[in-house]
């Protein structure tokens, strides 16, 4: 009976450990974070800060935006940090409301890049403009084109409108949706390509100086594009994960982000409750 009882207690203890990452013999805890790019200094600095708190961060890199949420839902990672609220809202629409934001990282205005022209005003009849093909960034790029007076969108465009919602296109611009990671690679083949800042940096572009057009970071309409740490809903109050969110706000991390992105991304501190409120609002609009 004693052996049976000990076995049950041991099994229960293992379940507790599994529920909040994995722990090592020295008492430190390993947390796997899914990312779509780990270049630069911000992650090594965050890992060092976390190590001082007894947390080992293991980065798991993905090459496709569709994979980190799947991996999180499947329990292959503990957190992810690659998406903004609007992207997460679209995921929730298609896969269920099981992943939630627990902290903010950065906001990064999307930019229009070109090897052929120096202003969106120089677009010619029938020119091609590449945009990311995921619904949230696709809509974001189209709004930027409207703000630059290239196109006009329907009044019911909403948060996830697509090219079918273009109601005026005086220059008959051809919109070419491509996988986000491919947006820098198609630059030789199009007049303009809208590229997320993280991907632009990985491609050797300067997200602050190289765009011929940059989204207005002070516009309230881009609040849904605050990037976040996300976890499975059952883990939203996990103290270890919350500690990582807190550590991201460290001044050393902020300086690294500024350096890594050439000033193209800004670390922001938005409360979990505010992030989840925005997520809920976006889901209700769909």
What feature does the model see in each segment?
Residues 15-19:
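C-terminal motif of bacterial Sec signal peptides marking the signal peptidase cleavage site
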């Amino acid at each position: 009976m004693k052996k049976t009882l000990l076995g049950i207690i041991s099994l229960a203890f293992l379940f507790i450990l599994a529920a909040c990452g994995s722990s090592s013999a020295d008492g430190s805890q390993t947390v796997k974070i899914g990312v779509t790019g780990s270049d630069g200094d911000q992650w090594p600095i965050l890992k060092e800060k976390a190590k001082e708190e007894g947390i080992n961060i293991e980065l798991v890199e993905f090459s496709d935006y569709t994979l980190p949420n799947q991996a999180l839902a499947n329990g292959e990672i503990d957190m992810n940090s690659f998406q903004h609220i609007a992207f997460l809202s679209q995921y929730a629409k298609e896969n269920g409301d099981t992943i939630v934001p627990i902290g903010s990282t950065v906001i990064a205005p999307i930019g229009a890049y070109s090897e052929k022209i120096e202003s969106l005003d120089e677009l010619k009849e029938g020119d091609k403009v590449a945009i990311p093909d995921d619904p949230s960034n696709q809509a974001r790029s189209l709004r930027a084109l409207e703000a630059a007076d290239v196109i006009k969108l329907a009044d019911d465009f909403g948060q996830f409108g697509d090219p079918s919602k273009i109601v005026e296109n005086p220059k008959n611009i051809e919109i070419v949706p491509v996988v986000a990671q491919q947006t820098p690679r198609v630059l030789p083949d199009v007049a303009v390509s809208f590229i997320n800042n993280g991907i632009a940096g990985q491609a050797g572009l300067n997200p602050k100086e190289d765009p011929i057009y940059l989204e207005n970071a002070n516009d309230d309409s881009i609040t849904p594009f605050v990037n976040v740490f996300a976890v499975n809903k059952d883990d939203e109050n996990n103290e270890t994960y919350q500690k990582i969110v807190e550590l991201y706000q460290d001044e050393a991390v902020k300086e690294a982000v500024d350096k890594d992105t050439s000033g193209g991304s800004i670390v922001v501190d938005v409360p979990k409750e505010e992030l989840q409120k925005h997520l809920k609002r976006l889901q209700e609009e769909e």
